[in-house]
Amino acid sequence: MPNRTVFFVSDGTGITAETFGNSILAQFAIKPRHVRRPFIDNAEKADQVITEINGAALAEGKRPIVFITIVNDTVREKIGSHSNALVLDMFRTFVEPLEAELQLTSNHRVGRFSDVAKSQEYHDRIEAINFSLAHDDGQSSRNLAEADVILVGVSRSGKTPTSLYLAMQHGIKAANYPLIPEDFERDSIPSSLAPYKRKCFGLTIDADRLSQIRNERRPGSKYAALANCRYEINEAERMMKREGISWLSSTHKSIEEIATTILRDIRPDRLIY
C-alpha cells in the first residue's frame, strides 16, 4: 500500500496526538513518514504548518493525514479548512460531544492533555520508574514490600521492558527477577522473593524465539543454545505452576498486551493513565 506523510499537530507537545494517531495507524499496513509539529498556538504558526502540509500533498500526489489536538477554535479551524489533507480533529471528535452530553464547557486550556509536571501523578510515575530501575534483573531485594508486581522468568523473556512500561505508563512499581539454572537446581524461587510470592507474575517465551534473541547477544554460546533454552523454559514453567504464580507467554504479544494482562491480574489500588 502506498505510504503517506502523517502530521501530528498540537498546541502542546504533540505527544497525545502522536500516541493516539499511531494507535489508529497501527491498524493499517502502511509505513507513514511522521512529522510532529508542536506548539502551534497562533495563526502565523498555523499558516506555516498549512504550507508544509499542502507542499507534501503536492509533492507526493496524495493527501497527508493530519492528527490535531488544538484548543484554539480559530487556529484549529484554519488548519482544517485550508489544508489539502485528511484532518482528524480530536477535540471536535471527542471534546465537543462530551461537552454536549455533560452539559459542561471544557477547560480549553493549551497543553491540558499533558499538563502533569506538578501533579501527584507525575511524582508517582517518577517514583515508579526509579523503583523499577533499581530493581531491574534482580539488582536489589530492598524494599520489595513496596512493589506492586515482581516479574519473574528466564533471562530475555521480556521482563525489563515490561517493568519499565508499567512504571512509565501507569506508575506501577515493578521489580523483575531472572529465574536461573541455580534456582532450578535448588528447585525453588529465589529466597528473597519467597515472602512476596503473591506479588509475582511470570513471563515465559517460545524456546525458538528465546534462542534467537539470546544468539543476538551471545552467539554460539550454551546460554543461547536451543536445548538450553528449552530446559530453562520447561523448568521455569514447572516452578511457576508449582508455586501458584500466574504467567503468560510473551512470544506473540506486544508490551502493551503483556502489561494489560498483568494489570488485570494484579488489580493495583492505584493506576495512572
UniProtKB/Swiss-Prot annotation:
Pfam families: Kinase-PPPase (PF03618). Keywords: Kinase, Nucleotide-binding, Serine/threonine-protein kinase, Transferase. It comes from the Bacteria. It is an enzyme of class 2 (transferase). Its EC number is 2.7.11.33, 2.7.4.28. HAMAP family: PSRP (MF_01062). This is Putative phosphoenolpyruvate synthase regulatory protein. It comes from Leptothrix cholodnii (strain ATCC 51168 / LMG 8142 / SP-6).
